[in-house]
Design a protein with these regions (language model features):
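Cysteine-centered motifs
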Residues: 18-21, 59
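Short, Lys/Arg-enriched N-terminal segments with co-localized hydrophobic residues
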Residues: 40-50
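Bacterial N-terminal signal peptides
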Residues: 59-69
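Non-catalytic beta-strand/loop surface segments
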Residues: 73-111, 116-118, 144-177, 214-267, ...
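Short pre-active-site segment immediately N-terminal to the catalytic Zn-binding motif
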Residues: 118-124
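Active-site SXXK
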Residues: 126-140
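M16/insulysin-pitrilysin zinc metalloprotease superfamily fold
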Residues: 139-142, 173-204, 283, 360, ...
């Protein structure tokens, strides 16, 4: 899964941070439908997980509302969706288990999260984490290829898998009584994966076709690929999750097995169970299925990656393509994540993104779409859920006849205004309420709850960090928002990408036809 989301723009406009493989399975074949979003923007895809311009706010808050601990105002009556707060325990082999009781329906969601993503790949092997995600469906000694997926379908369940820069996860949602079966399958493929060239090489072709379809033939995705590479000069977040084409085509069985043996182990995983169960029911199942799997001693206690130097100058990227119908610009700033930020900074960036770019009352939308109007869309976004520094993004699509320079002048003016002057009290309260309310309205998805606990925990946050998020949002002051804009939205910290129509190529192609 490549996921990060951008408001007002199609999925293909999202920076490639995570590959989501929507898996369609039949008894004879498996087809992977990859989507290329990335973290900060609005999406309307499976699981209902990206409904917000500020996805980090949603992901943390969705978990919070599931526990019933969020209170205040009109949200009070809607927060009691689970019968108990999440429970966490750790097996002797290092497997962390999180149980999220949800008694509304007799179904459960099992998600296993491995603390490894594309940023953990060896240089020259880009796309390996995602490639292995595909191969994890190729069977084990105990269960031949297709049996796991066929079992999920037979019991009326569904499944999915995704790879991001920081993690890889596998998911099943099934009737409650099938949890033990799902757990047995999942534990089995943690150690028993069998890979043969007759399965590996065709699957590599599937991934290459994904790249061709979703990136090579998609101008929006190509631009995002280039922006990310320019933003991250040294950090592996600059590599696309799906990989570079010339490196994907060289990946083989030995690469996949080495990666699997290195990273797929209980002490590098988090098992999240959400649904009509509690810890007392889940623990014996986990111990029976996962307890005997040995830990991998070579896995470090903390992931250490090359970090970015202090940005020294703004950068620009221009992509011209004859298929472009709507020119657009997007600017990404290098900013701290919830894991790397100083106290209060991440929450202030959450609020700043909501203030600047979420909805028709946001500052950018009003300045560019309503007041002028110079653009057909405008937005801003931030995602805190990242092990290392992440991005704050602004985007706009100019109207015909409007230059990028005109649009950027307005964007820069809005940022300067926010950075120099504390925002109005009524605006601050409005966006805080929006952050809370939007998340509450989206809480009715069990898989969402499991996904965002897993995402937060695999990127260095704790359950307490998740549970205390509403209080941190409520505590954000106007001065903190102003300071965040001033400190982090400096032009030198940014890469601006321009997507334009290549009219010369289009004319040459018309002449040839």
């Amino acid at each position: 899964m490549l996921h990060r989301t951008r408001p007002e723009l199609p999925i293909s406009n999202l920076p490639p941070r995570c590959v989501l493989c929507f898996v369609t399975r039949s008894f004879s074949r498996t087809v992977y439908h990859a989507v290329l979003p990335s973290r900060p923007f609005k999406l309307g895809i499976s699981l209902g997980i990206m409904m917000f311009a500020n996805r980090s706010a949603a992901c943390l808050f969705l978990a919070l509302v599931s526990t019933g601990i969020v209170t205040g105002g009109r949200a009070d009556a809607q927060t009691s969706v689970t019968s108990a707060p999440p429970t966490s325990f750790t097996l002797g082999n290092g497997l962390q288990v999180v149980v999220i009781p949800d008694r509304r329906t007799p179904v459960v969601t099992e998600m296993i999260w491995y603390k490894v993503g594309s940023a953990d790949e060896t240089p020259g092997k880009s796309g390996l984490a995602h490639f292995l995600e595909h191969l994890m469906f190729k069977g084990t000694e105990r269960h031949p290829v297709g049996e796991f997926s066929q079992t999920v379908l037979r019991v009326g369940g569904n499944e999915n898998a995704s790879t991001s820069v920081d993690y890889t996860n596998y998911y099943q949602r099934v009737p409650k009584e099938q949890l033990a079966t799902m757990m047995e399958f999942e534990a089995d493929r943690m150690t028993g994966l069998i890979l043969k060239d007759e399965n590996v090489l065709p699957e590599r072709d599937v991934v290459l076709e994904e790249y061709n379809m979703r990136v090579a033939n998609n101008p929006d995705a190509r631009l995002n690929e280039q922006i990310m590479a320019a933003l991250y000069l040294n950090h592996p977040y600059g590599r696309p999750v799906i990989g570079w084409h010339q490196e994907i085509e060289k990946l083989d069985r030995e690469d996949a097995l080495a990666f699997y043996r290195r990273f797929y182990a209980p002490n590098n995983a988090i098992l999240v169970i959400a649904g009509d169960v509690d810890a007392a029911e889940v623990r014996p199942l986990v111990e029976r299925n996962f307890g005997s799997i040995p830990a991998q001693p070579a896995i470090p206690a903390r992931r250490v990656r090359p970090q970015e130097p202090t940005p020294a100058a703004p950068r620009t990227v221009t992509l011209a393509d004859p298929r472009v119908e709507q020119p657009s610009l997007r600017r990404y700033y290098l900013v701290p994540s919830a894991t790397t930020a100083a106290a209060g900074e991440s929450a202030a960036l959450d609020v700043l993104a909501q203030l600047m770019g979420s909805g028709s009352n946001s500052y950018l939308y009003r300045a560019l779409v309503v007041d002028k109007p110079l653009a057909v869309s405008a937005s801003a976004s931030y995602s805190s859920i990242s092990l290392d520094p992440t991005q704050f993004a602004v985007s706009a699509a100019p109207k015909p006849g409007v230059s990028f320079t005109e649009v950027e002048q307005v964007i820069d003016g809005v940022i300067a205004e926010v950075a120099q002057n504390p925002i109005r009290a009524e605006d601050l309260e409005r966006v805080k309420t929006q952050l809370i309310a939007e998340a509450i309205y989206a809480q009715d998805n069990q898989a969402v709850l499991a996904r965002w606990y897993g995402g937060a925990l695999t990127t260095g946050l704790s359950i307490e960090d998740i549970r205390s998020w509403p209080d941190r949002i409520r505590a954000v002051t106007a001065e903190q928002v102003r300071a965040a804009a001033q400190k982090w939205l400096e032009k030198k910290r940014s890469v601006t990408g321009y997507l334009i129509k290549d009219t010369g190529t289009a004319k040459r192609e018309e002449k040839r036809s």
